[in-house]
Regions:
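Acidic, glycine-enriched loop/beta-strand segments at the rims
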Residues: 11-23, 354-385
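Metal-associated gating/positioning segment near the N- to mid-region
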Residues: 49-114
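Histidine/acidic residue-rich metal-binding segments in metalloenzymes
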Residues: 137-303
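N-terminal metal-binding scaffold of metallo-dependent hydrolase/deaminase domains
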Residues: 1-41, 413-414
Length: 417
């Protein structure tokens, strides 16, 4: 494919064209030329759009799709099409499928299903067999098959010794462990953040302590073993402080935060709407502000949509019984623009590649074209009728947004929303 993207503002600090409005000429997979008023050519398609911006392709570090096993929630093909039209050229795929992605053949299955699609999929292998927290999965074999990290999605590694052994073992092949932090004993039967809102609604609460105890424990283990650790979707003030302190001590720890935890609070729960039932739970505004500060000072390395499609049968039920999760790919950018400056959003939507040791390409002549196209001034409402995901469980339903992904260019393919 040959295209010329017209008058796009480049948002890429690693590029000499950062913050400049230019034309970008692309021949198949390579950026051929960047400059003003590039001459039209008969065999080049031209892309024109008001308020057009261009950045390195966005990468989401936590996406669940369902397939294999839960295709009623989402398929790989449709899910990656949704990702592309939401601006993501790459996603890290969680292992919470059926069967769990805990061996070489399951990793290969996912890659084979996705290799012809424009958005790249990078599987995360389960840390333990069947994500049951008892025995290590086939970590080395999965690494050789393309797994970029290991984690049991939404489940803490409760066995401290197992995490210690894992942290030591994967150093032999320079791999990364993802450790979700929530002490199940402290959480108990809690379903929302413990606080004024949970008391008012009569719902059982999950104290911040449930997360913070596990964060502190895992950081102690990392200090003992060395190696690298990624802590996903943190949600509390103290978690930010603990990770900031660990980084200052020189520990190789990275972390992420989910879009909904940056934008929403537990005040949304007043209507008992299960769309707001997520894990970790929506916290207070005090925590939300601490998370934003953590993003701004780079304590928090990446922002994820934590996209988790859930079918209506498991959402439209009593709050205590409903499953956790919200879809997030389609609303991520528009929601983030309400709380963060543009440059920081793009930074945090592209930084995940470095954490997972994936190649990134500056916007420069001769480089691979892995690009996201977006606007910042497009007013729109995230309505159910416009959702492309098979599941509609969005915490941002009917939210007014400003700014939207237009599409991507990756692997010689243009996908427009």
């Amino acid at each position: 494919m040959k295209i010329i993207i017209r008058e796009a503002k480049i948002i890429d600090p690693s590029s000499s064209f950062h913050n400049k409005v230019v034309d970008v000429k692309i021949n198949d997979t390579i950026i051929e030329k960047i400059g003003k008023n590039i001459s039209s050519e008969a065999d080049y398609e031209e892309i024109n759009h008001a308020d057009l911006h261009l950045s390195q392709g966005w990468f989401d570090s936590s996406v669940s799709l369902g397939e294999p096993g839960y295709e009623d929630r989402e398929t790989i093909a449709n899910g990656l099409n949704v990702a592309a039209k939401s601006g993501f050229t790459g996603v890290a795929l969680q292992p919470n499928t059926f069967p769990i992605l805990d061996n070489q053949s399951q990793i290969q299955f996912v890659q084979q299903k996705a290799n012809h699609l424009a958005t790249d999929v990078f599987p995360i292998g389960a840390f333990t067999k069947n994500s049951e927290g008892t025995d290590l999965a086939e970590l080395f074999d999965m690494k050789n098959s393309g797994a970029i990290a290991y984690g049991d999605y939404g489940k803490a590694i409760s066995n401290a010794n197992l995490l210690k052994i894992g942290l030591q073992y994967v150093q032999d092949f320079d791999a990364l462990i993802i450790a979700f932090c929530q002490d199940e004993k402290i959480k108990g039967s809690g379903v929302v953040n413990e606080g004024i809102v949970s008391t008012r609604l009569g719902l059982k609460g999950i104290p911040n302590l449930a997360e913070e105890l596990m964060v502190a424990r895992n950081l102690f283990l990392l200090e003992y073993t060395g190696g690298k650790l990624h802590i996903p979707t943190i949600s509390t003030t103290k978690s930010v402080a603990l990770i900031r302190e660990a980084k200052n001590k020189g520990l190789q720890v990275t972390c992420s935060v989910a879009v909904h935890n940056l934008v929403l609070t537990d005040e949304k729960l007043d209507g008992f709407d299960t769309r707001y039932k997520v894990s970790p739970p929506l916290r207070t505004n005090f925590d939300r502000i601490a998370l934003i500060k953590g993003v701004l000072d780079n304590t928090i390395d990446v922002i994820t949509s934590d996209h988790n499609p859930i079918d209506i049968e498991h959402k439209k039920m009593e709050f205590d019984l409903a499953k956790n999760g919200t879809i997030g790919l389609e609303s991520a950018f528009g929601a983030l623009l309400t709380v963060l400056p543009l440059d920081k959003i793009v930074e945090k939507l592209t930084a995940g590649r470095a954490i997972f040791k994936l190649k990134s390409n500056s916007i420069a002549e001769g480089n691979l074209a892995n690009l996201t196209l977006f606007t910042t001034e497009n007013d729109w409402t995230f309505s159910k009728e416009n959702i492309l995901s098979k599941s509609k469980n969005s915490a941002f339903l009917d939210t007014k947004m400003k700014g939207k992904a237009i599409g991507i260019y990756n692997k010689g393919t243009l996908i427009l929303a």
